[in-house]
C-alpha cells in the first residue's frame, strides 16, 4: 500500500519485486488523508497488507499506533514539490518567492492535495508569503485519491501543486516547475512492514530491495531522489 508520491516508482519496479518475492504483487495506491479509503483508515480497519510506503513521519506515527512494525523501516526516496498548469498554458513564473507570490495572487484557482504537499501549502507556504487571506479562499482540495494534475488537465483549476513524482505521469499538464529553493520542502518517504502482514520476512526482503541501489535508477526516473 503506497501513497501517491511513490506510486509510479513502485509500478515500474513490480516485475523485479515479483521475481524477488516469487509472488504476484497487488498494489493499493491511495492518500494519507482522512477519507474512508485513506491508508490510515484501511490499516485501522484491519485490511491485510504486507508493506506500507508513505512519508516517513506518517510511517513512524503508524508504528506508534501499532499499525506498522518498528523493525525493518527503510527510507526509499525523497521528493520535492512542484506546480503545474494545463497543457497549452504559459509557464508559471515561480522562480523566486516574490514571483511565486505574484503568480498565486493572479491565479483564478489553485489545486492542492490532502497529502504532504497540500498540508505544506495551506499550513505554511502561503503564510510565509503573506497571502493566506487572498489565496486560500480560491484554493481547492483535490480529494478522493485523485491527483491534482488530473484536475488541472480538466481545467477545473488553473494551477496546482503536488509532489513532482505525482505530477509527472499525468497527461494534459505542462511546465512542472519545482518551488524555488528558499521555499522548497523535501519530504522523505519510507517503507515498513504492516503489523498484520502474513509474511513479514518476505515483506522485509522487498523493502531492502526498494532501498537498495538496484532500485535507484527506476525510482529516479519518476522524479524522486534516492537516499
Q: Where do the PLM segments sit?
A:
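Exported/periplasmic ABC-transporter solute-binding proteins
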Residues: 1-37, 41-50, 56, 60-65, ...
Amino acid at each position: 500500500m503506497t501513497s501517491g508520491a511513490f506510486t509510479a516508482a513502485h509500478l515500474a519496479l513490480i516485475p523485479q519485486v515479483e521475481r524477488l518475492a516469487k509472488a504476484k504483487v497487488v498494489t493499493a495506491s491511495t492518500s494519507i488523508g482522512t477519507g474512508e479509503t485513506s491508508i490510515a483508515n484501511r490499516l485501522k480497519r484491519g485490511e491485510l497488507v504486507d508493506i506500507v510506503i508513505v512519508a516517513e513521519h506518517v510511517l513512524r506515527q503508524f508504528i506508534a499506533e501499532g499499525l506498522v512494525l518498528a523493525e525493518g523501516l527503510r527510507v526509499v526516496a525523497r521528493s520535492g514539490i512542484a506546480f503545474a498548469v494545463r497543457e497549452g498554458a504559459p509557464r508559471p513564473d515561480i522562480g523566486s518567492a516574490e514571483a511565486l507570490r505574484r503568480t498565486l495572487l493572479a491565479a483564478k484557482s489553485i489545486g492542492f492535495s490532502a497529502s504532504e504537499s497540500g498540508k505544506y501549502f495551506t499550513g505554511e507556504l502561503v503564510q510565509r508569503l503573506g497571502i493566506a487571506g487572498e489565496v486560500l479562499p480560491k484554493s481547492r482540495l483535490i480529494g478522493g485519491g485523485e491527483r491534482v494534475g488530473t484536475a488541472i488537465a480538466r481545467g477545473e483549476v488553473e494551477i496546482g501543486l503536488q509532489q513532482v513524482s505525482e505530477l509527472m505521469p499525468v497527461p494534459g499538464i505542462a511546465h512542472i516547475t519545482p518551488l524555488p529553493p528558499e521555499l522548497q520542502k523535501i519530504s522523505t518517504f519510507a517503507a515498513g512492514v504492516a503489523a498484520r502482514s502474513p509474511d513479514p520476512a518476505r515483506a522485509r526482503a522487498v523493502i531492502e530491495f526498494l532501498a537498495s541501489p538496484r532500485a535507484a535508477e527506476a525510482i529516479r526516473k519518476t522524479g524522486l531522489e534516492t537516499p
